[in-house]
Amino acid sequence: MTFNGWLQILIYIGILLLLVKPLGGYMTRVFTGERTLLSYVLGPLERGLYRIAGTDEREEQHWTTYSISMLLFSLAGFLMLYFLQRFQASLPYNPAGMTSIGPELSFNNAASFVTNTNWQNYGGESTMSYLVQMAGFTVQNFVSAATGIALAIALIRAFSRASGKAIGNFWVDLTRATLYVLLPACIVMTLVFVYLGVPQTLGPYVNATTLEGAQQTIAVGPVASQLAIKMLGTNGGGFFNANSAHPFENPDAISNLIQMLAIFAIGAALTNVFGRMVGNQRQGWAILAAMGTLFIAGVIVTYWAEAAGNPLVHALGVQGGNMEGKEVRFGITMSSLFAVITTAASCGAVNGMLGSFTAIGGMIPLINLQLGEVIVGGVGAGFYGILMFVIIAIFVSGLMVGRTPEYLGKKIEAKEVKMAMLAVLCLPAGMLIFTAISVVLPSAVASIGNPGPHGFSEILYAYSSAAANNGSAFAGLSANTTWYNITLGVVMLIGRFLVIVPALAIAGSLIAKKTVPASAGTFPTDGPLFVGLLVGTILIVGGLTFFPALALGPIVEHLSMIAGQAF
């Protein structure tokens, strides 16, 4: 660890914090229907879309109608993406002549991109046509991210409104998230990435002659436009198989910094949106402080582990940190920071190979996934995810003082706690049950690339990534098989929709309750005591569940490494 490394980390955190208030203020105006500078340009387009769709922007929906709208929209996107892949060979914009995709992989990819996971059991530049990349994956990158933002805003309304029955209009929230938040930012980012050297073309792959006289095919395509929403929407699926480690997706330190900021920008700003909409910005800062505490702890441990390196390599006389699987242009500091950011959010993009991290360095990204992607998390998804833990923390505090728990004047009762626990527990169920089956199923074990505890970690990481809708992987696992394509797809759907529906049910329940004025006995939720309680709840409820599994994987691998054994 070096002073320069810590300085880079502090600069990143400082810039991110500077973005929170202005972006949060802008998003608040967007979702409360106030005019913004972009309203003069995008307002007519927005109203035109409502007329075409037959949507009345003033008509709000009950939580069940909101949920059904979201589920039907997701189903339509799933089917469209599935059939685009199945008929890829017959469709235009396929200059490389890519063949159609099989049913199992098409199912996995459709589930992956609709759920904002972007798990990739394929190499983009060698498998997918331009049409599928643009009309399929990039479109889903936008709408899956917009769906997450819409759902977070709906849940915020449940706390911010004194009483009512409706939580908003899904179609309006989806449209505004896309038009006013994602699209403008992505246009600017795309232009910046093109300036930095990221390709953006519909032309065919380039054939080149190397210095040795051999022929080489250089994959290009509409990379920059997909890269922008891949990061801002915390999608993570790369145009290239190497993802953001590829020089065409991440040319230099500037592009790397922009991508890291984009991953956290909207998720962090949503805490400010929450504070503004409930009328007390300290509430939002308290939640961001809890997220930040866990994030900084993860960065410290990962950076320390990777900078310390591998003692087995040191024994050979090679000193220094662990550079295996890392790009020299980023080094240990930016690779470690990127790994924690991408797994703290539900992004999954990587600028280095996580499976090549040390056992402890790789365990932190795994823990981030298993906590349920609540450390900033995906756009929208991270915020409604951490609100589930907020409800549980408030319930625990109520038990300790012997009074009915309240949060922002809304009584937290049995229904809300049950729904929150359902949302929290469905993730470890999906992660652990399918991991247990896979380690005893011969066809699943055959896909492991490394023996011993690291092989177990590869499987555990795969299902943790799928359930958390992250998409990153310990790439030693050969997951493009029928078993993994189907089961990982199912786990992705569980991790997305068995969290969303309970969250919307909570929104519907809370919005119907009248706001109760704060009293002397009300537990303060905007100070350090609440931050500590929330962090403790996340670690105990979300973290201890996985300790036995972690003991079988990265912990025993680390102890074995110290004892002189590698896997």
Curated annotation (Swiss-Prot):
Keywords: Cell inner membrane, Cell membrane, Ion transport, Membrane, Potassium, Potassium transport, Transmembrane, Transmembrane helix, Transport. Its main location: membrane. The chain crosses the membrane at residues 5-25, 64-84, 136-156, 179-199, 254-274, 285-305, 328-350, 375-395, 421-441, 459-481, 486-506, 529-549. One of its GO terms (cellular component) is plasma membrane. It is found in: Cell inner membrane. The keyword Nucleus does not apply. It is a multi-pass membrane protein. It comes from the Bacteria. The keyword Coiled coil does not apply. GO terms for molecular function: P-type potassium transmembrane transporter activity; potassium ion binding. Belongs to the KdpA family. Part of the high-affinity ATP-driven potassium transport (or Kdp) system, which catalyzes the hydrolysis of ATP coupled with the electrogenic transport of potassium into the cytoplasm. This subunit binds the periplasmic potassium ions and delivers the ions to the membrane domain of KdpB through an intramembrane tunnel. PANTHER family: POTASSIUM-TRANSPORTING ATPASE A CHAIN, POTASSIUM-TRANSPORTING ATPASE POTASSIUM-BINDING SUBUNIT. The system is composed of three essential subunits: KdpA, KdpB and KdpC. This is Potassium-transporting ATPase potassium-binding subunit. It comes from Rhizobium rhizogenes (strain K84 / ATCC BAA-868) (Agrobacterium radiobacter).
